[in-house]
Amino acid sequence: MNAAPGRPKQARTAARQGEGIPMNGHAPLAITLGDPAGIGPEIIAKAFRQAPDATRGAFVAGDVAAMRRASQALALPGQPAWPVARIERIAEAAAVPPGCIPVLQVVAAPAEDIVPGRISAEAGRVAGHCVVWAARAALRGEIAAIVTAPLHKEALAAAGFPYPGHTELLQAEAAAHAGLAVDGMPVRMMLANDELRTVLVSIHMSLRDAITAVSFGSVLETLRITHRALQRMLGRAPRIGVAGLNPHAGEGGLFGSEERDIIAPAIAAALAEGIDAHGPYAPDTVFMRARARPGVPGSGEFDVVIAMYHDQGLIPVKYLGVEKGVNVTLGLPLVRTSPDHGTAFDIAGTGRADASSLVEALRMARTLAGA
């Protein structure tokens, strides 16, 4: 798999102009625009307005006009829109006064080509190139972390990006930067809130393919990546619970043999490497065992649950509140977080989108990056 399509002229110009770190020595956080036909620009504007502590020193990698349209749409009756400040270099983000949204012009999103709530190749192009620009800036050390606003996978594909989502696009960029094949840089997706964390063995694929993807190697690699990442986050070895693939974790082979033949041997191999992993457990109860009491970190039986496929892991976290969830990509040589929701085309342009998950993603990114 190759890296993403080359950047347009606007992105190349922004990359040249964006070089440099602020004079305080701290690289800022970059927030990618997301799909401009979705709620990305809106929740970014709301985050700057509602959570100045989380957005402090951050900037938007995107399109100035798109952010101004979003800010204007959110203006309260009788009050001016939240100002959007165009910056020419990354280093200028720190100097933008509070009450402004700093935007580095990465790629144009013409209003006539973007319709709120409508899938289009143009919107996918804009969203994809913002992510590519941010990935390359992070890999050069120019930004401390990337916080990605939602993109639409169908629009991304229509624009010619051969990736099912952010995670795979960032993986390809990081692998290319390191001179590796994509499979030489394995990554995993973690969804987390203040009560529960889960890491997925497979990400964006059909359920049929996800079952096939459960192998000794993929489960062991997931355990290794999770152990390393959570050890850095927590400052100690994490307690890892592993969900089975089948109902009741296979019930001793009655409902499937994957637990006995694949998952349990991978856990045993991880234990031999010093990883504190346990299971496989019945998928319908392991998440409850891992759930921490609100406000009491670490009070669950496990710090994280390894889920065998996308919906098995994401449903429990999202059920606890989409507004609290944060997506973290593990295994990359950069920090990337995102809100735990999509483009919400059904409410795009209405001003109803909730920025809470984006704010939590910003706070998580700042913590992970030490920014």
Q: What do the predicted segments below correspond to?
A:
Residues 171-186:
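FAD-binding core/adjacent interface of flavoenzyme oxidoreductases
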Residues 182, 190-213, 217-220:
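Ligand-binding beta-strand-loop-alpha-helix segment within the catalytic cores
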Residues 58, 167, 187-188, 196-199:
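Small-molecule pocket liners
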Residues 182-190, 298-304:
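Glycine-rich, flexible loop segments associated with nucleotide phosphate handling
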Residues 2, 9-12, 16-169, 175, ...:
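Contiguous, glycine/small-aliphatic-enriched amphipathic segments in soluble metabolic enzymes
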